[in-house]
Regions:
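Active-site helix of classical SDR
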Residues: 126, 162
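Conserved NAD(P)H cofactor-binding loop of Rossmann-fold oxidoreductase domains
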Residues: 94-99
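Conserved glycine-rich Rossmann-like NAD(P)H-binding loop of the short-chain dehydrogenase/reductase
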Residues: 32-49
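Residue(s) in the substrate-gating loop at a strand-loop-helix junction
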Residues: 146
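C-terminal helical subdomain
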Residues: 186, 207-243
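Conserved glycine-rich cofactor-binding loop
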Residues: 18-20
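Substrate-binding pocket helix/loop in short-chain dehydrogenase/reductase
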Residues: 102-104, 110-115
Length: 265
């Protein structure tokens, strides 16, 4: 059990803060007495959450409405916080989305936006906020990946590739940052109850109907515990952990075929 922090309060920045796992992280950090910087594309929802959480938890909440598919957004977020003298102690790179379909038929611009949000933005924000953490000698970064990171994903090829990048990137910099006081955790949830599947168009797939998915609150709680303990890789659910390890021992071609069968409608 983690005790709510005492003064001075630390500040957590959470991207994709208005829904799903991101919203549950917002609730968790607020309940542990963190001031919040919430980033999301949904400005109206941001304002509503900021006002409600300020009153409920008596914390400072800064809302920043940004489209993270725009390449200048990470720098704009960083500069806005610098100007406001808000220093980030915990960075939660949660924002992301997926696209379903055959690669030769999916929309290129949508996939480039996805690469920007899922991959480039995480790299950019981490680069911007990490330096101060290292100079201070403390800080935490949580990057949200997926069990998709552990194998190729036909029918969601670009999405799976971005999640593999997040896993590899996070593990590498976690190693680089040993003995600095800064930890990096990568959260790799399996399919989770959220609006993600509606956006990808997979909510009515047989896979989704047959699968017992974790709820976002449980996933966030497991990720939060792992982050606070300084774990590098966190995979919620025993079944997900077993599957993530099992693919290492199978031929890659076979793993890819199985992945395609699972993804298929």
């Amino acid at each position: 059990m983690f005790k709510p922090q005492t003064q001075p309060r630390k500040t957590a920045l959470i991207t994709g803060a208005c829904s799903g796992i991101g919203y549950e992280f917002t609730c968790l950090f607020a309940s542990y007495n963190y001031n919040l910087v919430l980033v999301d594309i949904n400005e109206n929802k941001l304002i509503e959450i900021a006002e409600r959480f300020t009153q409920e938890y008596n914390i400072c909440v800064t809302s920043i409405a940004k489209d993270l598919s725009i390449s200048t957004s990470p720098e704009a977020i960083y500069l806005e916080l610098q100007q406001a003298s808000i220093h980030i102690d915990v960075l939660v790179n949660n924002a992301g989305f997926g696209i379903y379909g055959l690669f030769n038929e999916t929309n290129l611009n949508s996939e480039l936006d996805m690469i920007q949000v899922n991959l480039v933005c995480i790299t950019h924000l981490t680069k911007l906020f990490l330096k101060h953490m290292v100079e201070k000698g403390e800080g935490k970064i949580l990057n949200v990946s997926s069990t998709a990171a552990f194998q190729p994903g036909p029918l969601m090829s670009v999405y799976f590739a971005t999640k593999s990048y997040i896993l590899s990137f996070s593990e590498a910099i976690a190693n680089e940052l040993e003995d600095t006081g800064v930890s990096v955790t990568v959260l790799c949830p399996g399919p989770t109850q959220s609006a993600f599947h509606q956006r990808t168009g997979t909510e009515n797939s047989q896979r989704m109907k047959d699968m017992k998915m974790m709820d976002a609150k449980t996933v966030a709680a497991i990720g939060f515990r792992g982050l606070m303990k300084g774990k590098t890789v966190v995979i919620p659910g025993a079944k997900n952990r077993i599957l993530a390890e099992a693919v290492r021992f199978l031929p890659r071609k076979q793993v890819t075929k199985i992945s395609k069968a699972v993804q298929g409608h």
